[in-house]
Amino acid sequence: VSGSLGSSTRDHRVNIQLLGEEYLVERIGMDGDLDKMKETIARLDGKVDAIGLGGITALFPVGGKTYLLRSARPLLEITKQTPVVDGTGWKKVLERQVILDLDREGIVPVRGKKALLTVAFDRYSMAQAFAELGCDLRCGDLIFSFGFPCLLKGFPVFHRVARAWAPAVCLLPF
């Protein structure tokens, strides 16, 4: 089950079969209500195999170190039986690989192109992939997250800012 801070109008459930096993996959929107999300996670504990967090990222890997968003900690600590995860693992592996594969296969030639990530802090591995492909990378973290009129030019600049700011940013309220 994915508990999302997003709109409940997008709720959905589907039965799927993988490797001969039947699974129910469900998305439950909380309409921005963090308390409702906490209650839902507590109610589902022990009744589902896993709970995914939607609309909030708990963990931010930045250059070999992972930072925990303080506001997300309570969501991760509610359950006693059921694991609670966010999309960090998917982002760390899958998004980076997709960028590299799309370029390598010629589906979306990215190498050397201009790339803008509005919030690279939440897509660190994707930013790395663009840098590896020699893209003219711009990171809009300061503009889009904090309203500072400053575009971070290139992965090395973004990386230095992310490492310096991550401890403080993860203390800010969600």
Put a short name on every predicted segment.
Residues 46-49:
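Short acidic/histidine-rich motifs immediately flanking catalytic phosphotransfer sites
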Residues 39-44:
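Short amphipathic alpha-helices and their capping/turn segments at secondary-structure boundaries
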Residues 2-37, 56-174:
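Conserved mixed alpha/beta catalytic, RNA-binding, or beta-rich assembly cores of soluble enzyme
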